[in-house]
C-alpha cells in the first residue's frame, strides 16, 4: 500500500525546486500558473516536462489540440509574480511585462529565462498530467540574476558556499 499523500508532501517539501510560471495559450484563451514540477527531458530533440493538476483552468487549455506553452524561470526578486500566478483570481498577467513568443505563448520579458514549447506528448499520472514540450524557442534574459527557489514551504535564495581554504 502506498504512503499517505500528507506523508508524501511532507517529504517533498524538503526538496528545493526552482519556481516557474507556466503560461498556456489555446486559440484566443491564455492562462498561467506557478509550477515547480518542471524538468528537462532530452537535448535531442529539446524536450522538457511540466506537471499540471487536472482540476485547473490551465489543464483545460493544455488539452486542446492547438495548445502551446511557455516555461518562465523566475528570478529571486519575482516572488510577487509567483504569488499572483499561484493564488490570484484576478488578471494574472496584469503584473510583469509580457510579450508573445514564437508559438504565441506569453513570456515574461524580465524572467531569468524562458522556454517556448509545443505539446509533444501527454501522460496521465494520478491527479496530474505530465506534458512533454518540444522547445521551439528559448532565451536567457537576465543571466547574472539568481533564480527563485521554493523549499520547506517558503521562498529561498541561493547563497554561494565559500571555502576560505581554497
What are these regions (language model features)?
Residues 1-166:
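Basic, polyanion-binding surface patches
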